[in-house]
Amino acid sequence: QLYNLDSTNMGPEQWQGIAAAVQENYDRYDGFVITHGTDTMGYTAAALSYMIQKSPKPVVLTGSQKSIYNRDTDARNNLWRAVAYACHPDAWGVQIVFDNKVILGTRARKTRTKSFNAFSSIDYPETAMFRDRRLIQFLQRPAEYTHAVFSTALDPNVFVLRLVPGMRADIIPMLEGRYRALVLESFGVGGLPGGDDGAMFAAVRDWCGAGHLAAFTTQVPHEGSDLAVYEVGRAAKALPGVLE
């Protein structure tokens, strides 16, 4: 047992511990199943997807919405399916197995707080699904998944800022000296309030000018961002140090 804690307390240190354990035992086993609380399982799956790349062996995360001690728990079914997928010869990569679905670790997001159907695959097909305890594969193992590449170094000094209407720009200078990168969750396809004349743009410009990174994404779950669509995004996209 690596950890015994509420998944709310999971973070980069634990992600590194899991990745290191998989790396240490990679040649001894054909697959791995990790039980994990659902609240941050999507974060862990995404992190492991980048720390354990191109794995021809499955690294599977699963858990339950109800405790295994409850009569109507989903834990038993989820664990059975996770092990069944990990044992399947066509299984691969970092995946979440939950409520009959197999979802890529980079695409899994918890979209329901109580239902057994807790996770959704965002803007990408599910890898596979279980139907009547039979695995139906939708995505095949990519040809380049022949040897796992482990990259377990992480920089935790990243701040995620979700923009809201009326937010003051002075929050960004307050991050100086504490964080090295900023992830901006913007509106719609992306942009900064006020465009290139606004205080928010100036704050991001100064942030990037100090040698930091600013990565733009969208708060909208589906279809992604595109800073080039509107004027409020184009100026930000042109700044050095801005990623999208």
Labelled PLM ranges:
Residues 1-24, 222:
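ATP/NTP phosphate-donor binding region
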Residues 36-42, 101-103, 188-191, 222:
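Gly/Ser/Thr-rich loops at beta-strand to alpha-helix junctions
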Residues 37-57, 194-203:
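Short Gly/Thr/Asp-enriched flexible loops that form oxyanion-binding sites at enzyme active sites
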Residues 45-74, 83-89, 208-218:
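Short, acidic/small-residue loops that bind anionic groups at enzyme active sites
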Residues 61-131:
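Internal gly/pro-rich beta-alpha loop/helix module
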Residues 104-189, 194-195:
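Accessory alpha-helical/coil subdomains and C-terminal extensions
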Residues 189-244:
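C-terminal non-catalytic interaction/assembly regions of soluble proteins
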